[in-house]
Amino acid sequence: MKAMKMLLPAAAALSLAGHVWAVRTVRADRVRLAEARRQVTIDPLTGLANRSGLSAVLADLVDEPYDVALVDLDGFKQVNDTFGHDAGDAVLVEVAARLSAALDEVDGAVVARLGGDEIVLVCPSPAPIAGILGAEVVRALAAPVVLPGGRELLVRASVGAVSAMAGDDSSRVLRAADLALYRAKAAGGGQVAEYDRAEDLPVIEQRPVVRLREMTGPARVLGGAA
């Protein structure tokens, strides 16, 4: 009986140790899973939501009105070609930080990077404020971006803005913003265009021409002399 009494504490200790190990393992698995999910929805360069993260946000907003501003940096390719990809990355990081700061106090607002230099702002709002949202983008980018090495670069952006109603299909909303964006770029860039069905639907046929002009026309990002 005495031997049994001595073994009980040891068995209990082993059981407790096993339980602690199991709990720690579960917690570690949860941390890894959370990090994996975060990596799936976050753009690694800018820290913004990525396309998957944006899709999740728009799915949550399906029953609410919201505004979208689709942003494309004018002449961004020239930044990479002239100053290198490190400079291009620095521009993207700074632009992302400024746009995030501009919406920092807006409840539920999200800034996401779709890829390349294309960024989208989503702002839940009971009243249509797409134009105001687009103007905020222009204001946020007014000051020059300082590149590695100290060179200052003035970055301009074209913005396509659209106000979505509750129940609107998110893919159609983004398409509308895209059409407005290309109208802004076709008009010279550096400006905001709000979606207008009468004006933007014909752009579908003109879009290849607009793309050709973007590739062959003058650069729209202005900075110091190369």
Q: Which residues fall in each region the model found?
A:
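Conserved nucleotide-binding and Mg2+-coordinating catalytic segments in signaling enzymes
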Residues: 37-56, 71-85, 93
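Alpha-helical scaffold within the catalytic cores of cyclic-nucleotide enzymes
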Residues: 96-100, 129-147
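Signal-transducing coiled-coil linker helices
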Residues: 1-44, 52-65
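Hydrophobic framework residues that shape the active-site pocket
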Residues: 76, 95, 119, 159
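Catalytic core regions of nucleotide second-messenger enzymes
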Residues: 107, 112-113, 141-157
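Conserved helix-loop-beta segment at the catalytic/binding core of cyclic-nucleotide signaling proteins
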Residues: 96-128
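Cyclic nucleotide signaling catalytic output domains
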Residues: 151, 158-188, 193-223
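Active-site-flanking beta-strand signature of metal-NTP-handling nucleotidyl enzymes
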Residues: 67-73, 111
